[in-house]
């Protein structure tokens, strides 16, 4: 388990309250990304910390109220880093963690922006 960054965006704290701001990425999740999302990790994995720490968009997952999509435009594409939020008050020792990461095309990004609740947009 490796700490890859910290959630710094105030909108996340405003929405969830006291969270574990450190975000980890496990070896198992890296394997998942490599197996399920082709070359995305090899090509764009280095942008995971930047995407979590300085996202362009943060959207809420419809299926899990404690999961957020951190999206950032990098190079010629968008990166989506899905993070499971852990609460500080739970005292379980768990940290917020990356579930997956993959590239998003503009059409998919627009669809997500339309269908999911947005808690942050750096264009606003």
Task: Put a short name on every predicted segment.
Residues 1-124:
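Ribonuclease/tRNase effector modules and their secretory precursors
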């Amino acid at each position: 388990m490796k700490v890859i960054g910290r959630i710094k965006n105030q909108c996340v704290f405003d929405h969830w309250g006291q969270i574990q701001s450190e975000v980890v990425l496990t070896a198992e999740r890296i394997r998942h990304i490599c197996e399920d999302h082709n070359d995305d990790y090899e090509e764009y994995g280095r942008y995971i910390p930047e995407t979590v720490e300085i996202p362009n968009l943060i959207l809420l997952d419809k299926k899990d109220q404690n999961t957020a999509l951190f999206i950032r435009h990098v190079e010629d594409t968008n990166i989506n880093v899905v993070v499971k939020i852990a609460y500080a008050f739970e005292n379980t020792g768990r940290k917020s963690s990356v579930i997956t990461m993959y590239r998003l095309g503009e059409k998919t990004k627009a669809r997500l922006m339309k269908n999911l609740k947005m808690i942050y947009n750096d264009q606003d």
